[in-house]
């Protein structure tokens, strides 16, 4: 295994942050914690329901970690949407992370997907059954065009996760494969479209700006994620099917050349994002800029990405890139380093246990299916 290219990573990260003019001022600390807890609380109650617990079959610790990660991503990045929209998006994107971490073969449950869809029957695949049940709560925030993007991109994501289960990096010479798979499983159009709730944006009046933003966000969001994930995935055997490593196989190039390819694409996309929208509708530009800055803050502060290890390693070094990286990291930590103990409570497992006890206490239940129905509408917040 090669040594991690720390100096190269520092230089790339610094250039990215400079290009997007990173300065996350999306929230005060109190506002950040308030939004985190609001979104978490609603989502935790959603996933604690008996139906979700029964169909998802996810280890409680993993589900808890997944929800905390996603709530952080949504609250930090979707800084301009309502708290209710943040909560509903947090539920939706937690479902996607659960699927991404799954190793179950989807083939048997997808045999009659379209026939069931056309007939209005519940999907055989449990993930689709739950996602479809929650989708109206997400789509109520958006107009028809953005909603269509959310639906289509989620469908693409499912297919991308299906492909990833084969751990296939592409055939040598298949240069289109890495980007094909990354666009499929990147949720870029879902993310890009979910920035524009109808209560804040006139979808028809800003149709061209929104369409362009979705197009630009598709690559920017996934490439930044791939770049910021490169350290944690570098020597992790479970993360060997990544865009960079697929470039190595399909393009028949070295790891350094593949990283350089990703770097140049990410920096170019960042320049485009700023240049294209700087002269457009101010509210559109503000939303995009807040997303970019919050998205970077989330990556720098979320322990899933382990970038604190890079910071500790280079802190005190006198190189220009090390000093700039540390300054950016500290800037992000000052606004975004919030302990989950301040907002991620109560735990999902605790809520699920309470619900299980309540169900067991029900008397004279004539139909077992009744107790499998959601006890809480996912559009209600439980304080």
Curated annotation (Swiss-Prot):
State the pathway, as annotated in the record: Sesquiterpene biosynthesis; trichothecene biosynthesis
What does the record give under GO molecular function? Answer: trichodiene synthase activity
Q: What is its EC number?
A: 4.2.3.6
Keywords in alphabetical order: Lyase
One of the GO biological process terms: sesquiterpenoid biosynthetic process
The answer on whether this UniProt entry bears the keyword Lyase reads: yes
Q: Name one Pfam family in it.
A: TRI5
Q: Which purpose does this protein serve, as stated in its record? A: TS is a member of the terpene cyclase group of enzymes. It catalyzes the isomerization and cyclization of farnesyl pyro-phosphate to form trichodiene, the first cyclic intermediate in the biosynthetic pathway for trichothecenes. It serves to branch trichothecene biosynthesis from the isoprenoid pathway.
Indicate the family of this protein. Belongs to the trichodiene synthase family.
Other remarks on this protein: Trichothecenes are sesquiterpenoid toxins that act by inhibiting protein biosynthesis.
Name listed for the protein in its UniProt record: Trichodiene synthase
